[in-house]
Amino acid sequence: MNTYKKLLFVYILLIIGVSSIPGQAMPKSWFSWGWEDKIYHMIEYSVLGILAYLSYCDHVRYSFSLLVVSGFSFGLFDELYQSLIPGRFPNAFDVIADGIGVTLGSISTHYLRKVFND
């Protein structure tokens, strides 16, 4: 198992771990616009997209499409899982932000690798 796959596995466990924190135990921001958590979701899932791309996209045919679909699916799973945690609620916009994050992370990694490998 390569280093990126190990990091991906640990990062997935980290996402699940954070999703397991009950809502009342989550830290509150000093100020809130009401949408900044979508930015956090995009950043969180961009890292997931980067690690998934580095782990699998050189080895699997149609891997980019599979990566994006898997990222959206994991985001959906994560939101459904959160519905089982006290004080946490699923949100369709979080799933969309997760999917955008995975897509942006993997696309940016693809192009950065092309630029720096050529």
Model regions: which residues?
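Membrane-interfacial alpha-helical segments at the cytosolic side of multi-pass membrane proteins
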Residues: E44-H59, G101-R113
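Membrane-interface helix-boundary motifs at transmembrane edges
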Residues: M1-T3, Y56-Y62, V115-D118
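Small-polar-interrupted transmembrane alpha-helices in polytopic inner-membrane proteins
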Residues: V10-S19, L66-S83, G99
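"…centered on the first transmembrane helix and the immediately adjacent amphipathic helix/loop
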Residues: M1-L54, L67
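Interfacial helix-loop-helix junctions of multi-pass membrane proteins
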Residues: K28-G34, F77-I100
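Helix-loop junctions at the membrane-solvent interface of multi-pass transporters
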Residues: V18-I21, Y56, L84-I85, I107, ...
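Post-HEXXH active-site segment of zinc metalloproteases
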Residues: A52-F72
